[in-house]
Amino acid sequence: MKKEKDDNLIAQNKKARHDYFIKETVEAGIALTGTEIKSVRARRINLRDGYVQIYGGSAYLENVHISEYKQGNRYNHDPLRSRRLLLHKKEIARLAKAQSERGIAIIPLKVYLKHGFAKVLIGVGQGKKEYDKRQTIKERDQKREIRRKYGI
């Protein structure tokens, strides 16, 4: 099974799939300033501690670090500012309902470019316990051994 090469992938939050059971995913646009999109295209973004917060009828991407643009001047952006996500009202309502449940988090999974626009794939996830993480690692190792043994 060959993996597809994704040239437009900017950043991926690998820790998210390790820490959460992802129930559903939604693609959203991000409202960025000029220096932010230049930094994103230069792959200077970190999703590790990011999450999505919904308030005031809008969804915001919080705690995602987009480094300042190197050639930027005094009008450079704040690296940790809240960034508005571009979603339909029905999608925001569905995410708000999910967020109100206990133990549910909305987290960014990956950032990529699509037709020249920056998009973020956000996932609705339920936190894993420590034994769930160990079980996932055990299953992954077993699958790897089977593939190695039978050459699949």
Curated annotation (Swiss-Prot):
Highest taxon of source: Bacteria
Q: Where does this polypeptide localize?
A: Cytoplasm
| A molecular function GO annotation | RNA binding
Keyword Translocase attached: no
- PROSITE patterns noted in UniProt: SSRP
Q: Which GO CC terms are listed, alphabetically?
A: cytosol
**Keyword Transport on this protein?**
no
> Example GO biological process term?
trans-translation
Principal subcellular localisation of the protein = cytoplasm
InterPro entries listed in its UniProt record: SmpB, SsrA-bd_prot, SsrA-bd_prot_CS
Q: What SUPFAM superfamilies does UniProt report for this protein, alphabetically? A: Small protein B (SmpB)
Q: Which UniProt keywords apply?
A: Cytoplasm, RNA-binding
Q: Which NCBIfam families match?
A: PRK05422.1, smpB
Record-linked HAMAP family: SmpB
What is the annotated role of this protein in its UniProt record? Answer: Required for rescue of stalled ribosomes mediated by trans-translation. Binds to transfer-messenger RNA (tmRNA), required for stable association of tmRNA with ribosomes. tmRNA and SmpB together mimic tRNA shape, replacing the anticodon stem-loop with SmpB. tmRNA is encoded by the ssrA gene; the 2 termini fold to resemble tRNA(Ala) and it encodes a 'tag peptide', a short internal open reading frame. During trans-translation Ala-aminoacylated tmRNA acts like a tRNA, entering the A-site of stalled ribosomes, displacing the stalled mRNA.
Q: Which family does it belong to?
A: Belongs to the SmpB family.
Q: What is this protein called?
A: SsrA-binding protein
Which species is this record about? Answer: Lactobacillus helveticus (strain DPC 4571)
Q: What is the lineage of its organism?
A: Bacteria, Bacillati, Bacillota, Bacilli, Lactobacillales
Gene this chain is encoded by: smpB
